[in-house]
Amino acid sequence: MKKVIFMLLPAFVSLLCSCGFNNNDNAGLKSGAVTIDSFLEVTKADLATELKKSNKAVFYESMITFVNTVDEDPGNIERVTNIVQDTSMCIQFVHQGDNTYITKNPSWWLKGLPINLDSIISLDSAIIRLQQANIQKPKSRYCVLRYDSCPTQITPAYIFGPDSTRFVRVDGLTGDVSEIK
C-alpha cells in the first residue's frame, strides 16, 4: 500500500501545481485550463470563462499584437488594455491618438461608455497614480501587462511612450508608480 502511495505522490503534487498552488514566480499564470502562454490561442469568451473559474485577480492584455505594431505606427493605433480586479468588475483603458479614456465595466468584453481621463479625480487606478506622481504623460501611451507569475501574485505592468525608451513601473498590487531610468 505504501508503495502505491509513493508511486502516486508525484502525480498528485503535479496536479496541485497545475491548479495554481505552485508559488514559483516564473511559473505560467494559470486560470483553469488556460495558461497565459497559450493566451493568444484562446478567444475572449474562453478566457472570460476561465477567469470566472479561477476567481483570481489577474492582469492581462486584451490585444494580441504589441511591440511590432507600436514600432510600425505608434501614433494611430487604438490600444485596449483591461485590468481585471475580480470576476465582476474591471477597468478598461482605451488609448486612441492623444486621448485616453477609462470605462468601468461589469464585463470586459462589453463596450463601455468612454470617460475622459482628465475628468476623473477619484478613480484609484495606476494611471491616476501616474498623474499624482507628476510623471509626464506621453501623448500616446501603451500598457504592457506581463504574465509570468501565479494567480496569487500579480506581475507589475509597464507603461511607456511611443518611442519605447521611457518606462514607468506600475506595481500591480499597490498601484504605486515609479519611473525606470
Question: Regions from the language model: what does each represent?
Answer:
Residues 1-17:
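Sec-dependent bacterial lipoprotein signal peptides
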